[in-house]
């Protein structure tokens, strides 16, 4: 929340940790004048900083405005592994604090650590305990483990000014991030998934699908499922090739061709995925968080209403679907963010947190 000290804290973290573990400090004004970014055509003000702790290297995002966080999280390719919620001890939780926690819940931030800022300005221990209790209650309301959530008491400004007592609290915060937020699973260790981009028949050998392996590893001889658009089917991978070379396996990040046993060219199409059996399911109806582009961002000039039928672009393909709006919402204006329920005309392989774009006549909405 504005003036609770998010940006000062970001500057303090980079400064204190650079002193202790190396790396570069970032001044407040370097972070505060967040450059405008164009992510998928959406204008977002955001500052990216990086820092090292004793155990890890962190990438950290600081956004000036609430709307910027929403846009950042909806469009961001990177999943947030955790968040630092900054609350000023002098004010306690404000309406924006609740919004930030709700936002974390909506976009699937798995872990929150609380930094209670400006504690140098509060002498009253009981007041600090009261603020902590209020924050814990709020977290619990939104299904975060309020009782277990670590709360670090500190002063970002004093730490930034080099006061050793408060610098130590920044180190405490860093240690807490290391211990409380689990190390995310690398994409190579996750179950195999390949969004299909193209399908070929190779006479005498069968059908080859091509695409970039999104996660995991596919080995020759393994069983795979073909999921989405049609009824889910199973087959065996009989070959993997990359740049015309035959390989034993295809790994996350690689563009490969996968040869499939006994699968006909017409059984399979772009927009389906190849996956490790049982790891992803097809769905027609889903709940989503959507940011609607403003006119300036190249979006619509007019609102849309329930029953709107655009195209929904998932991974490699467009599918038509229709929109249901929340109760009491009549229309959606360009620039809004909205929770909507969508029903597609074909099933698509989906899991929680999957990103998609809404398009109309070839342009993004």
UniProtKB/Swiss-Prot annotation:
<dbReference type="InterPro" id="IPR004160">
    <property type="entry name" value="Transl_elong_EFTu/EF1A_C"/>
</dbReference>
<keyword id="KW-0342">GTP-binding</keyword>
<keyword id="KW-0963">Cytoplasm</keyword>
<feature type="binding site">
    <location>
        <position position="7"/>
    </location>
    <ligand>
        <name>Mg(2+)</name>
    </ligand>
</feature>
<protein>
    <recommendedName>
        <fullName>Elongation factor Tu</fullName>
        <ecNumber>3.6.5.3</ecNumber>
    </recommendedName>
</protein>
<dbReference type="Pfam" id="PF03143">
    <property type="entry name" value="GTP_EFTU_D3"/>
</dbReference>
<keyword id="KW-0547">Nucleotide-binding</keyword>
<comment type="subunit">
    <text>Monomer.</text>
</comment>
<dbReference type="InterPro" id="IPR033720">
    <property type="entry name" value="EFTU_2"/>
</dbReference>
<keyword id="KW-0251">Elongation factor</keyword>
<dbReference type="GO" id="GO:0003924">
    <property type="term" value="F:GTPase activity"/>
</dbReference>
<dbReference type="GO" id="GO:0003746">
    <property type="term" value="F:translation elongation factor activity"/>
</dbReference>
<comment type="function">
    <text>GTP hydrolase that promotes the GTP-dependent binding of aminoacyl-tRNA to the A-site of ribosomes during protein biosynthesis.</text>
</comment>
<dbReference type="GO" id="GO:0005525">
    <property type="term" value="F:GTP binding"/>
</dbReference>
<dbReference type="GO" id="GO:0005829">
    <property type="term" value="C:cytosol"/>
</dbReference>
<dbReference type="InterPro" id="IPR004541">
    <property type="entry name" value="Transl_elong_EFTu/EF1A_bac/org"/>
</dbReference>
<dbReference type="InterPro" id="IPR027417">
    <property type="entry name" value="P-loop_NTPase"/>
</dbReference>
<feature type="binding site">
    <location>
        <begin position="1"/>
        <end position="7"/>
    </location>
    <ligand>
        <name>GTP</name>
    </ligand>
</feature>
<feature type="binding site">
    <location>
        <begin position="62"/>
        <end position="66"/>
    </location>
    <ligand>
        <name>GTP</name>
    </ligand>
</feature>
<keyword id="KW-0648">Protein biosynthesis</keyword>
<comment type="similarity">
    <text>Belongs to the TRAFAC class translation factor GTPase superfamily. Classic translation factor GTPase family. EF-Tu/EF-1A subfamily.</text>
</comment>
<keyword id="KW-0479">Metal-binding</keyword>
<keyword id="KW-0378">Hydrolase</keyword>
<feature type="domain" description="tr-type G">
    <location>
        <begin position="1"/>
        <end position="185"/>
    </location>
</feature>
<dbReference type="InterPro" id="IPR031157">
    <property type="entry name" value="G_TR_CS"/>
</dbReference>
<keyword id="KW-0460">Magnesium</keyword>
<dbReference type="InterPro" id="IPR009000">
    <property type="entry name" value="Transl_B-barrel_sf"/>
</dbReference>
<dbReference type="Pfam" id="PF03144">
    <property type="entry name" value="GTP_EFTU_D2"/>
</dbReference>
<dbReference type="InterPro" id="IPR041709">
    <property type="entry name" value="EF-Tu_GTP-bd"/>
</dbReference>
<dbReference type="InterPro" id="IPR009001">
    <property type="entry name" value="Transl_elong_EF1A/Init_IF2_C"/>
</dbReference>
<dbReference type="Pfam" id="PF00009">
    <property type="entry name" value="GTP_EFTU"/>
</dbReference>
<dbReference type="InterPro" id="IPR000795">
    <property type="entry name" value="T_Tr_GTP-bd_dom"/>
</dbReference>
<feature type="binding site">
    <location>
        <begin position="117"/>
        <end position="120"/>
    </location>
    <ligand>
        <name>GTP</name>
    </ligand>
</feature>
<dbReference type="InterPro" id="IPR050055">
    <property type="entry name" value="EF-Tu_GTPase"/>
</dbReference>
<dbReference type="InterPro" id="IPR004161">
    <property type="entry name" value="EFTu-like_2"/>
</dbReference>
């Amino acid at each position: 929340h504005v003036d609770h000290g998010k940006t000062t804290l970001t500057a303090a973290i980079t400064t204190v940790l650079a002193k202790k573990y190396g790396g570069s400090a970032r001044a407040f004004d370097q972070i505060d004048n967040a450059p405008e970014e164009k992510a998928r055509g959406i204008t977002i003000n955001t500052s990216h900083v990086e820092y090292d702790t004793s155990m890890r290297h962190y990438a950290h995002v600081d956004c000036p405005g609430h709307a910027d966080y929403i846009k950042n999280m909806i469009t961001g390719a990177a999943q947030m592994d955790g968040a630092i919620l900054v609350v000023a001890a002098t004010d306690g939780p404000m309406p924006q604090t609740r919004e930030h926690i709700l936002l974390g819940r909506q976009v699937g931030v798995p872990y929150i650590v609380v930094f209670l800022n400006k504690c140098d300005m509060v002498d009253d221990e009981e007041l600090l305990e009261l603020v902590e209790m209020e924050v814990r209650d709020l977290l619990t309301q939104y299904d975060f483990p309020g009782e277990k959530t670590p709360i670090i008491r500190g002063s970002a400004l004093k730490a930034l000014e080099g006061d050793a007592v408060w610098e130590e609290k920044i180190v405490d915060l860093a240690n807490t991030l290391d211990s409380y937020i689990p190390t995310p699973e690398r994409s190579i260790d996750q179950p195999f998934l390949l969004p299909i981009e193209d399908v070929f028949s190779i006479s005498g050998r069968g059908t080859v699908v091509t695409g970039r392996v999104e996660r995991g590893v596919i080995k020759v001889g393994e069983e795979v499922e073909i999921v989405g658009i049609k009824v889910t089917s199973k087959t065996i991978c009989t070959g993997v090739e990359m740049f015309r070379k035959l390989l034993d396996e295809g790994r996350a990040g690689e563009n490969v061709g996968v040869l499939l046993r006994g699968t006909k060219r017409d059984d399979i199409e772009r927009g389906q995925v190849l996956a490790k059996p049982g790891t992803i399911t097809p769905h027609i109806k889903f709940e989503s968080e959507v940011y609607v582009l403003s006119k300036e961002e190249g979006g619509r000039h007019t609102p849309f209403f329930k029953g709107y039928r655009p195209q929904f672009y998932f991974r490699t393909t467009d599918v038509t679907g229709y929109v249901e709006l929340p109760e009491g919402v009549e229309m959606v204006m360009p620039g809004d963010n909205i929770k909507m329920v969508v029903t597609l005309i074909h099933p698509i392989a989906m899991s929680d947190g999957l990103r998609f774009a809404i398009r109309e006549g070839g342009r993004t909405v």
